[in-house]
Regions:
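Composition-driven recognition of glycine/serine/threonine/acidic- and proline-rich low-complexity segments
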Residues: 3-204
């Protein structure tokens, strides 16, 4: 199920809150979580949660949907190539989606997947969440997280708000793929507890 197939209202919500064109990309500065100050515990619990983010969005909302923005062959960003365990692989696909809670985009996700792995394992992925495949296959090994801060304007959102994201590497045999996720303004990750006034010490 995709958000844009549900009804016209949801499409209007997308145009207001997410107005970027595929491929959006994430040419940002990634850091270890220990090198930044995460503003509050609620955000920390989303950023560093090692479980399935898809399942967390599903459990935190009454209506869940996945919007496939696009998937195509693309040269990864330099910061993506430096993370990938390149083993003779020269062709990758970029896949970008929105995870939607209650008819609103909560998470932007970008995955960089070796073409050979797409051909052998993921050729029929379509609208299915990639996380469903990854977390149901015990063969995958996940790396530690890196985090980033990115302006909401990169996603066509008319706001000066700073958004937080994370990425990790999933490895299976000789294949390595990047899964990066940015929490959009409507995501519950930003609903900090009352009385919390801890501010990030890091800037974009």
């Amino acid at each position: 199920m995709t958000c844009y197939h549900t009804n016209r209202f949801i499409i209007r919500v997308f145009r207001v809150s997410f107005n970027a064109t595929f491929p959006v990309g994430l040419p940002v500065n990634w850091q270890a979580p220990s090198d930044v100050t995460i503003p509050h515990l609620q955000l920390n619990s989303w950023l560093l949660d090692t479980g399935s983010l898809t399942e967390r969005v599903q459990s935190s909302s009454e209506h869940f949907a996945l919007e496939l923005l696009g998937q195509q062959t693309q040269t990864p960003h330099s910061n993506e190539l430096s993370l990938l365990l390149v083993n003779g692989e020269t062709s990758y696909q970029a896949r970008e989606i929105l995870l939607c809670g209650d008819h609103t985009p909560w998470v932007f996700a970008r995955s960089i997947i070796p073409q050979a792995f797409v051909d052998s394992e993921l050729s029929n992925l379509g609208q299915e969440p990639l996380g469903k495949r990854l977390f149901n296959d015990a063969r995958f090994i996940r790396s530690a997280f890196e985090v980033c801060q990115v302006s909401a304007s990169q996603f066509g959102i008319h706001s000066n708000e700073v958004l937080w994201g994370r990425r990790s590497l999933f490895t299976l045999d000789s294949y390595s793929m990047i899964v990066a996720e940015v929490f959009l303004p409507a995501c519950p990750a930003y609903r900090q507890p009352a009385g919390s006034n801890i501010q990030s010490e890091k800037q974009l």
